[in-house]
Amino acid sequence: MSHDSDDKTYPYQKDDAELRRRLTPMQYEVTQHAATERAFTGEYTDTEDAGIYKCVVCSTPLFESGAKFHSGCGWPSYFKPLNGEVIDEKIDRSHGMVRVEVRCNHCGAHLGHVFEDGPRDQTGLRYCINSAALNFESRPENE
């Protein structure tokens, strides 16, 4: 699933040549062409430090460490985004499935998918996000 045919215009307009220079090949394929990194290979799958996870393309803060949980799926999982305005959700009918794709609402970068099998004592949602779509900014617990 590529973003090439999308009709939504995002506030942050990306220059493809600049993105290819700045991002790793995996980051580019994940964020720009909705690729998925292999399970259990992502940099942030097991990260437990306090901080904020930001979009690797535009640096928009997306998730905080307090919403992260171990789902066992092989990708970083969160029960909610930082707020309701940072995420864009689209129906994804690729690979013979119907899922909800999650994108950065500022630049349109593909992040992953959201499923309804998250912690029931929280939102019940599991935002399953590719590490390649994120940068982590460590912060002290009390900030």
Curated annotation (Swiss-Prot):
InterPro entries: Met_Sox_Rdtase_MsrB, Met_Sox_Rdtase_MsrB_dom, Mss4-like_sf. Zn(2+) binds at residues 55, 58, 104, 107. Its cofactor is Zn(2+). Its EC number is 1.8.4.12. One of its GO terms (biological process) is protein repair. GO terms for molecular function: peptide-methionine (R)-S-oxide reductase activity; zinc ion binding. It is an enzyme of class 1 (oxidoreductase). Gene3D superfamilies: Peptide methionine sulfoxide reductase (2.170.150.20). GO terms for cellular component: cytoplasm. Keywords: Metal-binding, Oxidoreductase, Zinc. Belongs to the MsrB Met sulfoxide reductase family. This is Peptide methionine sulfoxide reductase MsrB. It comes from Burkholderia vietnamiensis (strain G4 / LMG 22486) (Burkholderia cepacia (strain R1808)).
